[in-house]
Amino acid sequence: MIFCNCAVSGIVEANMTLMNNWSEDEKANYGKKVMVLQHRLAETGLFSDEALAGLLDRHPNHLIDFQHIPDNPDYPDQQVTVDFTGADGKTMINAAKSDGKIWINVREAMNRDPLYREILDQLHAELEMQTGRNKDRRNCRGGILISSAKASTPYHSDPTMTHLWHIRGHKKAWVYPRGQKFMPDEAYESIVLGEVDEDMPFDYALDQEAVVAPADLYGGELVLWPNRSPHRVENVTYCVSMVMEFSTKKSAFTNAGMFANGVLRRQFGLHPSWSEASAAEKVSK
């Protein structure tokens, strides 16, 4: 396998796996339970500050989200898009390492950049070996997240399957059950209907019943959770992570059903429940 210590020492060859072996329980629980596993992405050299600055320089600007979170108590989760025209990758990295609340999402970096694509392909191969499944995941979008020490991700639910590969820095992650107390149907319907992005109402009292509360991540962890599980993240230091997002037939089926329920609720005044619906009702939607 060929990895790149980008712009530092050129191309180096190394025969290495990127993930530790999974136990039989971990293989059986993939996609069913919250799990924290180990990986070695940092050892590729592709996620150093120097390598990431080079990636930012060559990645299409329209696929880079540079956001600042202002200190506004009335809108604590507000994100302001920053015009980074004229800024090079090193400047953006330095901004993320400043005292501000900075969030940089390098969208589809793992898919589009040849150096990172090679790593993504190997991850797919290793995940297939560990789980026996890969067809849907092969269509994933792989983005790289670069965020400041004060940045956080508010309580939300993803309509896609999500794999969080934490690579550098210290962050805390909370993952919650999927029941109505944590994720009411109406709140999730708002997500698939496009009424909101992915954020949901949150009360810190929910932390007492979180499945993971919290997981301290220091780099080298892969965090997995069942589709639609609410979660949130708080940085402690400057952080670098990679996120895989993809849909499966099951997640697409659920989203379509929740979309239909949202329409029935909003346009016809009905009160459908996805969790209590029979299999026949779910298929009919």
What feature does the model see in each segment?
Residues I2-W103:
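N-terminal auxiliary "cap/dimerization" subdomain that precedes the catalytic jelly-roll/cupin core
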Residues D99-D121:
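Hydrophobic alpha-helical hairpins/lids featuring a short glycine-rich hinge
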Residues R112, D121-T162, A213-L217, T248-K285:
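Conserved double-stranded beta-helix
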Residues Y116-I119, T153-D158, W174-G179, M183-Y188, ...:
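A short secondary-structure junction signal
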Residues L145-S148, D158, T162-K172, P177, ...:
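Short, conserved beta-strand element in jelly-roll/cupin
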Residues R168-L224, S229-P230:
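Double-stranded beta-helix
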Residues T237-F253:
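A short hydrophobic beta-strand segment most commonly corresponding to one strand
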